[in-house]
């Protein structure tokens, strides 16, 4: 592994203190001095094809943003290092950096593929395709009435319901918004898609887990009130009444570098189910 790049969220490290420390440890442990540094907000359209590894310094939001904006030709794995708040998606905490780099040198790690979604939507009479790592959510505006949804799976009607919204999630996203809305945890290495309603008023829609190659078509009706499409909780697009949103598996997956002692269930316990200061030191 010769070419390492670092994508950093500058709002998490104003004075480059963490960045400089990371670069120094890479230099000393990996014997690599030529390290490219990128602003995580400016990743789109950059040619990163020469990289063997991209380190993402930030929190979950930083990693989500980078994953969506990476060019489809990008093939290197990502090592997420949490310097944010929660860090569910990150491979390690910043405090574990030195040990992680030593494991990297001994190849005590494995690349895991994380499924992504493709959302096709008509925006201003132009079809747009948008990637998502966590989820695609369709929901009413703040002061809007409930939305009527029609959901089709592979051209077959699954449900018609009224509610605040719905979430189409990847397994990676099952610990995020989907979980908050009552959806199940799904092991992130699986290739399935879940649909979870948000405040289903009619109780005619239940969460469902579908095979990964399913095509989901959503028709959202709100009598002219606001409807928003939100991607990974970061990009919001106002939709027209009777908008059609099509969601399916993206042909490209995210390659996430995880170490062999990575414990998904420990992450769930410590960072999702017991996300509090008292549990930060739990080691079991």
Curated annotation (Swiss-Prot):
Catalytic residues (positions): 60
Disulfide bonds: none
Keywords, sorted A to Z: ATP-binding, Cytoplasm, Kinase, NAD, NADP, Nucleotide-binding, Transferase
GO molecular function term, any single one: NAD binding
Swiss-Prot/TrEMBL cofactor(s): a divalent metal cation
Residues the entry annotates as binding NAD(+): 60-61, 134-135, 145, 162, 164, 175-180, 234
Cellular compartments per GO CC: cytoplasm
Swiss-Prot/TrEMBL GO biological process terms: NAD metabolic process; NADP biosynthetic process
Xref: SUPFAM superfamilies: NAD kinase/diacylglycerol kinase-like
Subcellular location, record wording: Cytoplasm
The enzyme's E.C. designation: 2.7.1.23
Known function: Involved in the regulation of the intracellular balance of NAD and NADP, and is a key enzyme in the biosynthesis of NADP. Catalyzes specifically the phosphorylation on 2'-hydroxyl of the adenosine moiety of NAD to yield NADP.
Homology family: Belongs to the NAD kinase family.
HAMAP family in UniProt: NAD_kinase
Record's protein name: NAD kinase
Species name: Clostridium botulinum (strain Eklund 17B / Type B)
Lineage: Bacteria, Bacillati, Bacillota, Clostridia, Eubacteriales
């Amino acid at each position: 592994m010769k070419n390492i790049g670092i994508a950093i969220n500058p709002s998490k490290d104003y004075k480059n203190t963490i960045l400089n420390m990371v670069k120094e440890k890479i230099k000393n442990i990996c014997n690599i001095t030529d390290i490219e540094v990128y602003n995580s907000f400016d990743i789109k359209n950059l040619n990163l094809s020469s990289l063997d590894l991209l380190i993402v310094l930030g929190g979950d939001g930083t990693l989500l943003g980078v994953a969506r904006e990476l060019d489809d030709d990008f093939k290197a794995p990502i090592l997420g290092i949490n310097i944010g708040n929660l860090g569910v998606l990150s491979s390690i905490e910043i405090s574990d950096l030195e040990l992680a780099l030593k494991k990297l040198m001994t190849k005590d790690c494995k690349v895991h593929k994380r499924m992504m979604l493709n959302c096709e939507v008509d925006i201003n009479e132009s079809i747009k395709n948008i990637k998502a790592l966590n989820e695609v959510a369709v929901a009413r505006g703040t002061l809007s009435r409930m939305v009527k949804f029609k959901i089709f799976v592979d051209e077959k009607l699954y449900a018609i319901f009224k509610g605040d919204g719905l979430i189409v999630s990847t397994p990676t996203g099952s610990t995020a918004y989907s979980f908050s809305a009552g959806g199940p945890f799904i092991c992130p290495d699986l290739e399935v898609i879940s649909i979870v309603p948000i405040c289903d008023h009619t109780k005619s829609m239940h969460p469902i887990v579908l095979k990964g190659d399913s095509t989901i078509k959503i028709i959202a009706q709100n009598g002219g009130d606001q409807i928003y499409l939100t991607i990974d909780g970061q990009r919001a697009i106002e939709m027209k009444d009777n908008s059609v949103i099509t969601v399916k598996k993206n042909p490209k997956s995210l390659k996430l570098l995880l170490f062999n002692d990575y414990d998904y269930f420990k992450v769930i316990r410590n960072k999702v189910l017991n996300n509090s200061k008292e549990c930060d030191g739990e080691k079991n």
